[in-house]
Amino acid sequence: MADRTAPRCQLRLEWVYGYRGHQCRNNLYYTAGKEVVYFVAGVGVVYNTREHSQKFFLGHNDDIISLALHPDKTLVATGQVGKEPYICIWDSYNVQTVSLLKDVHTHGVACLAFDSDGQRLASVGLDAKNTVCIWDWRKGKLLASATGHSDRIFDISWDPYQPNRVVSCGVKHIKFWTLCGNALTAKRGIFGKTGDLQTILCLACAKEDITYSGALNGDIYVWKGLNLVRTIQGAHSAGIFSMYACEEGFATGGRDGCIRLWDTDFKPITKIDLRETEQGYKGLSIRSVCWKADRLLAGTQDSEIFEVIVRERDKPMLILQGHCEGELWALALHPKKPLAVTGSDDRSVRLWSLADHALIARCNMEEAVRSVAFSPDGSQLALGMKDGSFIVLRVRDMTEVVHIKDRKEVIHEMKFSPDGSYLAVGSNDGPVDVYAVAQRYKKIGECSKSLSFITHIDWSLDSKYLQTNDGAGERLFYRMPSGKPLTSKEEIKGIPWASWTCVKGPEVSGIWPKYTEVTDINSVDANYNSSVLVSGDDFGLVKLFKFPCLKRGAKFRKYVGHSAHVTNVRWSHDFQWVLSTGGADHSVFQWRFIPEGVSNGMLETAPQEGGADSYSEESDSDLSDVPELDSDIEQEAQINYDRQVYKEDLPQLKQQSKEKNHAVPFLKREKAPEDSLKLQFIHGYRGYDCRNNLFYTQAGEVVYHIAAVAVVYNRQQHSQRLYLGHDDDILSLTIHPVKDYVATGQVGRDAAIHVWDTQTLKCLSLLKGQHQRGVCALDFSADGKCLVSVGLDDFHSIVFWDWKKGEKIATTRGHKDKIFVVKCNPHHVDKLVTVGIKHIKFWQQAGGGFTSKRGTFGSVGKLETMMCVSYGRMEDLVFSGAATGDIFIWKDILLLKTVKAHDGPVFAMYALDKGFVTGGKDGIVELWDDMFERCLKTYAIKRSALSTSSKGLLLEDNPSIRAITLGHGHILVGTKNGEILEIDKSGPMTLLVQGHMEGEVWGLAAHPLLPICATVSDDKTLRIWELSAQHRMLAVRKLKKGGRCCAFSPDGKALAVGLNDGSFLVVNADTVEDMVSFHHRKEMISDIKFSKDTGKYLAVASHDNFVDIYNVLTSKRVGICKGASSYITHIDWDSRGKLLQVNSGAREQLFFEAPRGKRHIIRPSEIEKIEWDTWTCVLGPTCEGIWPAHSDITDVNAASLTKDCSLLATGDDFGFVKLFSYPVKGQHARFKKYVGHSAHVTNVRWLHNDSVLLTVGGADTALMIWTREFVGTQESKLVDSEESDTDVEEDGGYDSDVAREKAIDYTTKIYAVSIREMEGTKPHQQLKEVSVEERPPVSRAAPQPEKLQKNNITKKKKLVEELALDHVFGYRGFDCRNNLHYLNDGADIIFHTAAAGIVQNLSTGSQSFYLEHTDDILCLTVNQHPKYRNVVATSQIGTTPSIHIWDAMTKHTLSMLRCFHSKGVNYINFSATGKLLVSVGVDPEHTITVWRWQEGAKVASRGGHLERIFVVEFRPDSDTQFVSVGVKHMKFWTLAGSALLYKKGVIGSLGAAKMQTMLSVAFGANNLTFTGAINGDVYVWKDHFLIRLVAKAHTGPVFTMYTTLRDGLIVTGGKERPTKEGGAVKLWDQEMKRCRAFQLETGQLVECVRSVCRGKGKILVGTKDGEIIEVGEKNAASNILIDGHMEGEIWGLATHPSKDLFISASNDGTARIWDLADKKLLNKVSLGHAARCAAYSPDGEMVAIGMKNGEFVILLVNSLKVWGKKRDRKSAIQDIRISPDNRFLAVGSSEHTVDFYDLTQGTNLNRIGYCKDIPSFVIQMDFSADGKYIQVSTGAYKRQVHEVPLGKQVTEAVVIEKITWASWTSVLGDEVIGIWPRNADKADVNCACVTHAGLNIVTGDDFGLVKLFDFPCTEKFAKHKRYFGHSAHVTNIRFSYDDKYVVSTGGDDCSVFVWRCL
């Protein structure tokens, strides 16, 4: 019995005792079929109460902790814990998986909820962020996710009446979520004063925004919107765990054991207290309730389920019970009856009836029970306790017989002897005690040899011996009852054991895996009858093994269900059942045993479906004698597809080497050559490790692949068209069922799949991001909409794609060994089959995952490695080809029969209408009928069968066949040897294409006179190829060893070949027969060359570091060149045949003279003068420039120079073929590079006439033929080589504005940092001294004077309740573009400033606002499609900025896109249909992302450029083509599926043009693109080639261009000095040939336009300086609509004391006076310096302005003439004030001073006093009402009071308390302590202002918020209202004179906001 096979018998889960009531809630429901659904451990249970039956869902692999019922009451969603937890949606009727949601949550899924129509599912994770996710669950697609909360979330629910509203609750919070686009945004519920902030445990949503929630204290909290509106107190007396909403109303259940029913308005109906009922008990706690019509379900903490019928509510029925919380270890089965007993840490012992599936008795103990044992007659029951004691009970009435405590540690194992006389008790102390049953359990023996705790014990049949296992893994034997150790091996061997529950011992060594020391098997039990053993382990698996199982690593069957530790397993007395107990899940599973041969087939397909199937994956072999793997298959399974370095590493390598060598001054790089190459033909086909990779297109062309190229071969013309989109070896290829589309998959770190069109060779979709290493198998679905792929990662992941969209639909792990083929079921789109090494699996897609079943072999066959598979014509038939040569025929997943087809593996199979064709390793093609009953015809592939039209020769007869296909009356065959043949049905075969076999190709030589070349490879063949139009192999010869080099003699008659063993031979070039051979070296021969003319000498270079020189005529070695310190890589002769140039692996360039090999040292200048016969060397000054910057890693393997010494071609280790102009002096020359080879280009050679370049590709086995395209012929068709990169060093032009914009760093903005450098303790953190004011309330003293002088304009004091944004002065032009548009045919305009999107009506001038952004808006675009009228998109700065799409008229948000562009989004644009949106970020990669904005789905994303991208715009007629421009950047993009492909703009040979920094883009018909450059030129592109320049369209940079869709006219805007004929705005015709200029009349020296838009007869212009101007097209008149401040912070602000005017003063050097009523600019004055503060005099006549340079000026308000100015300080004036009597001027500066001036003394402004002792810079000042005092706030968070005008500080609190102030703008002081927020660590409150009525204060802070408080504001963290609009810093704020308006100014946003007071 020493085989290791799995047993043929099986288990099936029949019953589970238990319900998970702990740590879960809301997990119990009625289904539509009136069954009860719940979960326990890892099993979903559907329990039918009427029939008392259970169904199980086994799709999880760990504990289930959450459950939701679909509105249809049939589907169920369950979520689990685990490292990669997933959600299963399954059908409660047939317990099959419907969908899997995975790859998002970690740790676990805590809550689930379906929305009201059941389409979407919300889930909450157990991760630290408690992530909330919304799924389209049928598709398995994540719609949105967001951080849920910092603490646990307990419940989540959809609002049934508002489709996008979700509510979640948990620890101390409730949140109301809105789903918009892909953004989930939450608002916290406001508890307010209505109820205490506390933990909310459950919730239900009702109509009209009402939410009911259950709180921890037993109250019901009722919410309306976000606010708590009322509480229902004492609904329960403790926490409410569960709330269930249904038609009838609501049911709640709590920790108090009560169920309460409420009507739909939450009025109480009734209360049921389960504690008071018959089965109730103290401490009963309800975790889950469900109400359906007249029935209620309640699940309790202690794992019971009650059913209550409402009419008989005092008689609840206990329909299910299990063990409570606490580990469950004890299990014993009755020796005579179908009874089981369990004991648990919940201190109960329970007796279960296995026949009735019911609990029949329960007995509570004082202590936790850890082991139980029945006496052999079943009358007594022994219990082992956790405290070291044991108790014996009488079974019939459960009364105690004895209670003995001899040990301290837990008793884990006990057994009665088979004769019933002894009880052995094993404890964790180590010994086993033996007690005599008849003597009232007197202790009579002790087994004490064990050093560790006892884990298992077994008695011998005769009760004379005992064996033990312990924690140290020892197995010991004792004589009974004395307990003496037994050591004699012989004696032990013969003992028959009564039971076998030990895990150690020879009989069970097979249960342990090989080579590991683990202790994770907790329990086993042997069934001697059926020779099987059951085991339970720490991974939650119950396994069946054969018994005995002697060899380690035996195969088994495994069963899932328990989640974590299975603590015990036992057979029932009659072996009908196995019982298993779960430790942590404290459940008992009852499994039915199905012996071998019973209803085998029926059972195999039982609906035991789940993620893991019940026949294990680790143990998938039913055989111990696994057949030998076929050598080909074994070799293939061992191929490693990892690369040392991938092409995508190149930019980084370049960057690193730049950083390393940054000191090198940059010399002028050599120019790239004019000539170019075109790939014309490739010899080769990849057959050695690929299959099914050869197809006919409908046009009859043949498509296959080699290296990184997919080939479309025309049989008639023997020509090839090539798809060159891949950048590494292609490994798989498949063709679309309907169209001529092909999918190809490649090698790669992130391996890509391309779907492309064979007609146009254009990529339709590029699929990435799912596979590692490579893609080894592909197949289209029958309808062609989906594609399935298999990767080469360790799990061979399977991915199902919607290829057009480029989205993955579903993924799963495939198999641990290689999968060879995947096939889609032609009848069912969602089914697949895979075959591979010892593997066949049938897959069913379920949402985002797959469920699988393994093929069931039964007795028909045994598990084999399968090489190919096909579906039959009948629906459920599958045919697979095995490594043995058999065809296996399957029906569904059952094997029907096998048919012998080939000798050796069946590698290929193709299904026809009426049959199949197969191909095998035996080189035979067989045609079969449709059931593989008859073989209709065979074709052996032999040389003799080849037709004359063949394009080559067969290397050998019967080559192994790897691919086969039928079509066009032929069979197409691909062989392992790299041949493609076409077999005519009548027999003759034509060889179409061939190449080398597996192995690297290095040797390449071109014939000196004819178009012929030779190659030699590690595949041990030498081949001669014809390169004329025939393209075929002329001759081939097998060699004894592989070879790495070859060379023709000068006359072409002889061919020398160097081999890898150090020998070389010379063969006749025509017959390839030997002429001579030598073996002088041990290491490989690396290069070989004949000298020129007569070919007198042959030089042979080897890896032995020598070059040997032979005389050809005498066949003697005449010289040896010594002196190289490393292996030789290249050699070349000079044209006289005298001098040899040698390169070595140590990068030495050496020279030797023939014949003796004497070494010469030659100076570099001389080397160039020598005429060389050939140049294949890679070192020396003339080819220094061929080495890339990162060449420490990659090597240039080969070079070849044309005869005229003008072009040098090289091949390198990145698969690039490059062309350089020779000589290549200086570093890093420019080149043209070409792709096609995959990893290494090993050799390159020009043909004798230099018209063709030949290259060979190392491991890709390909020989590629490139034709040289000369300069002259190119013009007609521009050749698109990958140009060498446009270098950063190259100057892209300069302009100050562009440079500034490039340098803007948005990160400093994101994190709200204080805008002033304050130091000290924040006010709300300072310790407060007790003020005088806090006197006793009753006092005879006179009343305190007012804090603030009240201006009694109106008699009644007005409280400001609310602010509303009324108008904004500002437009962001300084770093944005194209952000100003017409709406509604020119009636409105839309633009942005700060964080506000603004729509302004041109006729009324009124504005409306979009205020949902949280920081500066950076870009704005309007959807041009009529279907999406007035749809606007805007985006902003931020760490995870969002794009908002909104309706410009209603301001309603249509979608929100959360982006990955860190820092901010700086340009967005809609596609032609308006459905897509493209965005580009200011992140370091300048990522470009395309979105489907309505769904919120990201379509594609890719790094755009290393420097700033300014504009990215879709072509106006396309949804897939767009253009991006930026700093030296011009790319033309195509959206292919979910990938972005680009072509760089090719400048070509247009004389003056070079790649500039491009700033703007416009479009014309016929694929014309116009781009505006930094130097004022406009570049005109056709496709991606530059065709002309519009020179100097503007004199400075062309910042903006606008394409008018209706007539194609183009508007440009630039930076230009206004002249007569020029202008900063121009209107052009469609081709930009003629234009008309417009002046803007702004009066500035240089006009700089940032945005243009054309409406009906008008052009809308936005300038850098914040002006918005409308220009008439006819009359060229310009009208200024908005004239905001220019760039620079605005700090100065003052409102007029008696009129609706205010003044703002900014760092832009201007002061502006605005009219509040008419919302317009009245006047502006240029001050010449940045201004920091402003103040009106109380009489309104004068205004004082303080400057940043320490100067201040006083202007007369009416004329704005200067009345006086003075500069007594050198640093900034921070605040300036005029006293209430117009007499004193106070000037506060950064120099810690306040200066006083007397205005009555006239304009010379002499200082009359100043304040000192000010601790820091001044920030605000206020005069007292009588003008005698001034209060000064400082940068140290200190407020001081000084006398005026002497400046003495007042310190007596009594005096200060009595002062009445004329105004209050201070942010410091007890009166305003409440304005400081909690989160002000890095950010300050910058400004404040109290109303003239003295009742309110408004503040502005570093978060960009304007806040409204009551005044005085003396309680910390006072309540307030907050208003958004400004971006980061609000710098100043004032009420207007009559408190009707608030004016606020922004720091960075340069905007002035006017708010109406309500």
From Swiss-Prot:
Molecular function per GO: microtubule binding
Chain spans, region Disordered: 603-626, 1322-1353
SMART domains: WD40 (SM00320)
Transmembrane intervals: none
Chief localisation class: cytoplasm
Location relative to the cell: Cytoplasm, Cytoskeleton
Protein family membership: Belongs to the WD repeat EMAP family.
Function recorded in the entry: May modify the assembly dynamics of microtubules, such that microtubules are slightly longer, but more dynamic.
Protein name in the entry: Echinoderm microtubule-associated protein-like 6
Species assigned in the record: Homo sapiens (Human)
